[in-house]
Regions:
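A short, gly/pro- and small-residue-rich
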Residues: 66-84, 155-176
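Structural motif
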Residues: 9-15, 35-39, 58-61, 78-80, ...
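Helix-enriched interaction subdomains in cytosolic or periplasmic regions
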Residues: 46-78
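A broadly used, surface-exposed interaction patch
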Residues: 30-31, 65-104, 115-123
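Short, charged, surface-exposed secondary-structure boundary motifs
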Residues: 83-92, 110, 131-136, 173-182
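N-terminal basic/disordered segments at the start of proteins
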Residues: 2-23
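A short, well-structured beta->alpha microelement
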Residues: 29-48, 79-87, 119-138
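Conserved small/polar residues in nucleotide/adenosyl-binding loops
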Residues: 192-194
Length: 194
């Protein structure tokens, strides 16, 4: 076996840092360092540390910001249909008025699931982090008690009294991203040696 792929994992929430560390221990082909950083903090960490790594994995908006700011490949952990379905079922079980709020990577999947399973759910897409607060204020005024969201609106929802359900990535989503990172790096190396 060749050298280990050096992966920097930048997670937008603590649970994903823990998941990354646990999963890294199961693989002998990677050296994964996990750090906590959401959007701008994640970008700062990436800029500070990328020179010591071959590739970066992160999630959603944080991954997108990092990809625009560093010269090494960035793999988005992504959001799995199963991840969203678990959150929808959790929200349904609260028996409260709930909505899905997030960037299109979340809301597109949520719309698909809700259409197929005929789950009546209000779904709101945001394009920038600044939109989240004003939209949450409107949801509060309209009587929403629960919101499925990513890390960007999570804390503000708690602050104004809406119960947030954080969309978390499953081990399967993380495994797929790490596999993609290893494949991307191996492809890069094979092209260098042609």
């Amino acid at each position: 076996m060749g050298e280990k792929v050096r992966i920097l994992g930048i997670a937008p929430y603590k649970g994903l840092v823990t998941l990354m560390k646990r999963y890294a221990g199961q693989r002998d082909d990677i050296q994964l360092t996990a750090m906590l950083g959401n959007v701008e903090t994640g970008l700062s960490l990436a800029k500070e540390h990328y020179r010591n790594y071959d590739i970066i994995i992160s999630r959603a908006n944080t991954a997108s910001r990092i990809a625009k700011g560093v010269p090494i490949p960035v793999i988005d952990i992504g959001i799995d249909y199963y991840d969203v379905l678990l959150c929808l079922k959790t929200a349904e079980n609260t028996k409260t008025k709930f909505a899905v709020l997030g960037f299109r990577s979340l809301t597109t999947i949520a719309k698909s699931i809700c259409n197929v399973l005929k789950i009546p759910t209000d779904i709101f897409s945001i394009n920038t982090t600044s939109e989240a607060s004003s939209l949450l204020d409107k949801l509060k005024e309209q009587g929403y008690k629960t919101v499925i969201c990513d890390t960007v609106p999570y804390n503000y929802a708690k602050l104004i009294g809406i119960t947030p359900i954080l969309l978390t990535s499953s081990m399967e989503s993380l495994k797929a991203a790490v596999d993609q990172a290893v494949y991307t790096w191996q492809t890069h190396l094979s092209l260098i040696h042609i």
